[in-house]
Amino acid sequence: MKKYPKIGIRPTIDGRQGGVRESLEEKTMNLAKAVAELISNNLKNGDGSPVECIIADNTIGRVAESAACAEKFEREGVGSTITVTSCWCYGAETMDMNPHYPKAVWGFNGTERPGAVYLAAVLAGHAQKGLPAFGIYGRDVQDLDDNTIPEDVAEKILRFARAAQAVATMRGKSYLSMGSVSMGIAGSIVNPDFFQEYLGMRNESIDLTEIIRRMEEGIYDHEEYAKAMAWTEKYCKVNEGEDFKNRPEKRKKREQKDADWEFVVKMMIIMRDLMTGNPKLKEMGFKEEALGHNAIAAGFQGQRQWTDFYPNGDYPEALLNTSFDWNGIREAFVVATENDACNGVAMLFGHLLTNRAQIFSDVRTYWSPEAVKRVTGKELTGLAANGIIHLINSGATTLDGSGQSLDAEGNPVMKEPWNLTDADVENCLKATTWYPADRDYFRGGGFSSNFLSKGGMPVTMMRLNLIKGLGPVLQIAEGWTVEIDPEIHQKLNMRTDPTWPTTWFVPRLCDKSAFKDVYSVMNNWGANHGAISYGHIGQDLITLASMLRIPVCMHNVDENEIFRPTAWNAFGMDKEGADYRACTTYGPIYK
C-alpha cells in the first residue's frame, strides 16, 4: 500500500464549561464521526484504499485545543481539514490556521444551537485572515438529535474532500521530464515556478540518454523483461498491423520490427523505474537507480531527436497510461506525450479526482456538418448532428480510452482499476492494433496504438494553459464520445493518420459564448492538446482549481453547481470575474 495524506476532522464546540459544553460533546463528536464515515465509505485513493480520516482527540473549544489538534494532524500526515459543529464556537480560537491545508467548515443547520452563526463567523475570520475556506450549510433545518448528513451537505463534503485529497497528494511529489522541449511546443517548456508555487511539486529532469544507458548496461529487471515480452507477444505483437503507411523502401524488415518490440518493452520498464523506482534494482546493485524520481507524473519528449533515431515512445506511453500491463491490473500512470507538462498536469488533475486512466490527445480537427456532408456525402446524426471534434494522438493513448470495458448494463466505460475485470483487459487489448510507425515522421520506427473509442461515454476535456502576466488558467468542456457512421469515420480518418487512435468528441452546448456551438469550443481551446477524463467532472475540477488559485477561463458547468471557497463571494456577483479576482488576490498556496 502507498502512503496517502489523510483528512483531518475538527469537531468544534462552545467552550463554556458548567452545562453548555457538556451538553454538546456527544452531538459534536457524533457529527465528526459521521463525516469521517461518509468520506471513508465513498472515496478511495489511487490504489483502492479508502481515504482515511483522523478525528481530533477531543472537541475543540479553546485555542489550546486547536493547537493540540494541529500538532496531532501534522504528526498523522493530514493534508486537509473539515471543521464540523452544531453550535456557536469561538471563531478565531477554533479555526484551522494551517496556510497549506484546503479547509472546509460544516455548520449544522439546527435551531437549538446556532451552528450556522459559528459558520458565518468563522468564515468571516477565514476571509479576513486570507485563509479561504469552503462553507457547508444544509438547506433544511435538522433536529438536534439527528446525526444524519443531508444529501446536499454530503455532496459538498465529498466534493471538497475529493479535491482536497488531490491537492494534498500532489504536494511534495515530482514531475519528471524525460527529455526537454518537443518541437517548440510551449507546453513542454516546463515552468518550475508554476509547479513549485501552485502545486507544491518538484521538477526532475533526465536526458534521454539515460534510457539508452540503462538498456545497454542492463539496468532493468531481466526477469520482468522476459515476462513482459511473453505478454507482449501474446496480446500486442499478435495484433501488429499492416505496414501500409510506409513506402516499401522505408519498411523495416521482420527482424528489425522484432528488435523494435524488444526495445519498446525495455523502454516502458525503464521509464516506469525512472518515475517511481524499483527495489529489484537495489538487489542487482544499482542503489541509486532503484530510488526513482518520486514522480506522480512525467512527460516524454520523443520528437524529434529521439524519434529520428530510436523507436518512438508510443508503446511505453500508451501502456503506462493504461490501467494494466504484464503485471496485471494496476493504477494508471500519468505520462504526457511530447513532454507537454501543461497537459500532463491536466491529466494529473483528472486522474487524482477520478482514479481512472486519462486520455492524452491532439485537439485535431473540428468537422462541421457541412464539411462532413461535402467530403463523405453523408450527414452526421444524433449527438454528432451539430459537428464533431476529432481527438487523435500519435499512438500513445491509454488503452482504457477504447471504451471496451463495460458496466453492468453493457455500456462502455473507463473504470477505476479495482473495478476492471480480466474480460475488460482482454477486450481493450483485442480492440487495439499496433501499427508500425510512419517513418516519414518517426524515422526510428516503433509501433503506434490504434483504436476507435466507443461512443456514449460521458467525458470531460480539460487543459491547463500558462499566460504571461496572468499565470495558469484552466479550460473545461464536458461532453460525450460519439460513434459516427463507419463510412464517415473511414473517410475522415484517412485524411489524418489512420494508424493512430481516434476519439470523436461532442461538447455539451449552452448559452455561454465559448459553447454556443461545437466550432466555438474548438476555436476557444487554448493549445494543441487536451486531457480527457471519463465522467462529467467539471464541478470537481472547478473546486480543485479554486483550492490551487487557478482561475477557470472556460467551462460549461451549471453555475448553480459551482462550489468554491466562501470568500469568492466577496469578489463580485459575476462568478468568472470573481474567480479571477480571488485567485489574483490570494495567489498560489506555496509562494
From Swiss-Prot:
InterPro entries to which the protein is assigned, alphabetical: Fuc/Ara_isomerase_C, Fuc_iso_dom3_sf, Fuc_isomerase_C, Fucose_iso_dom1_sf, Fucose_iso_N1, Fucose_isomerase, Fucose_isomerase_dom2_sf, Fucose_isomerase_N/cen_sf
> In which broad location class does this protein mainly occur, judging by the first location in its UniProt entry?
cytoplasm
Keywords noted in UniProt: Carbohydrate metabolism, Cytoplasm, Fucose metabolism, Isomerase, Manganese, Metal-binding
The Swiss-Prot or TrEMBL record annotates one GO molecular function as: manganese ion binding
Q: Which residues form the active site?
A: E338, D362
Q: Which GO terms describe its cellular component?
A: cytoplasm
Q: Which HAMAP family match?
A: Fucose_iso (MF_01254)
Say which family it is in: Belongs to the L-fucose isomerase family.
The protein depicted here goes by the name L-fucose isomerase
Native species: Bacteroides thetaiotaomicron (strain ATCC 29148 / DSM 2079 / JCM 5827 / CCUG 10774 / NCTC 10582 / VPI-5482 / E50)
